[in-house]
Amino acid sequence: MAVLALCLLWTLASAVRPAPVAPLGGPEPAQYEELTLLFHGALQLGQALNGVYRATEARLTEAGHSLGLYDRALEFLGTEVRQGQDATQELRTSLSEIQVEEDALHLRAEATARSLGEVARAQQALRDTVRRLQVQLRGAWLGQAHQEFETLKARADKQSHLLWALTGHVQRQQREMAEQQQWLRQIQQRLHTAALPA
């Protein structure tokens, strides 16, 4: 900036040509006064340009600082977005695994229900047999028939207990499946909400 001011002063000085020597008592002092004013104006212009240069330099420095802050903020946001995407992917993977477990549990519950149906049918057949034996024993209370009756009755009681236990097991599995389905619905809702644009 100082070089620019010196160049400007040199240009102004070379532009002002010395006037021919005037006789004594001529306008020579006025020319020196004009030259002084020109130099003073050039100096003020140089100072003003120097001020503008410094202000512009300060603004550029501030803009560079702001740009650096903006870049860091963008980098931070990018990291946050990547972490959110990773968490969402992990959640989806967990959801898929839970869905597989729920399907397996559903298949086991269906198999248990089928077994329970078979046990119920077998118990009904056993009850029918017990009823027939009771009818037979009404007429004559025979020792061997009585023993067979007691054996069948014990088997019927045992199967009733087994049926009761299996029924409780199936009901417990159904409750667990209902809880897991509710939990899966909540996770799917959170995933759907997280996928919506902000």
UniProtKB/Swiss-Prot annotation:
Belongs to the ANGPTL8 family. Proteolytically cleaved at the N-terminus. Expressed in liver and fat. Enriched in white and brown adipose tissues. Induction: Highly up-regulated following high-fat diet treatment. Down-regulated upon fasting. Strongly induced in the cold environment (4 Degrees Celsius for 4 hours). GO terms for molecular function: hormone activity. Interacts with ANGPTL3. Disruption phenotype: Reduced levels of serum triglyceride. Mice gain weight more slowly than wild-type littermates due to a reduction in adipose tissue accretion. Plasma levels of triglycerides are similar to wild-type animals in the fasted state but decreased after refeeding. The lower triglyceride levels are associated with a reduction in very low density lipoprotein secretion and an increase in lipoprotein lipase (LPL) activity. Glucose and insulin tolerance are not affected and no alterations in glucose homeostasis are observed in mice fed either a chow or high fat diet. The lineage of its organism: Eukaryota, Metazoa, Chordata, Craniata, Vertebrata. It comes from the Eukaryota. It comes from Mus musculus (Mouse). InterPro entries: ANGPTL8. Hormone that acts as a blood lipid regulator by regulating serum triglyceride levels. May be involved in the metabolic transition between fasting and refeeding: required to direct fatty acids to adipose tissue for storage in the fed state. According to a report, may act by promoting ANGPTL3 cleavage. According to another study, not required for cleavage of ANGPTL3. It is found in: Secreted. One of its GO terms (cellular component) is extracellular region. Keywords: Hormone, Lipid metabolism, Secreted, Signal. Its main location: secreted. GO terms for biological process: cell maturation; fat cell differentiation; lipid metabolic process; negative regulation of lipoprotein lipase activity; positive regulation of protein processing; regulation of lipid metabolic process; regulation of lipoprotein metabolic process; triglyceride homeostasis. This is Angiopoietin-like protein 8. Residues 1-15 form the signal peptide.
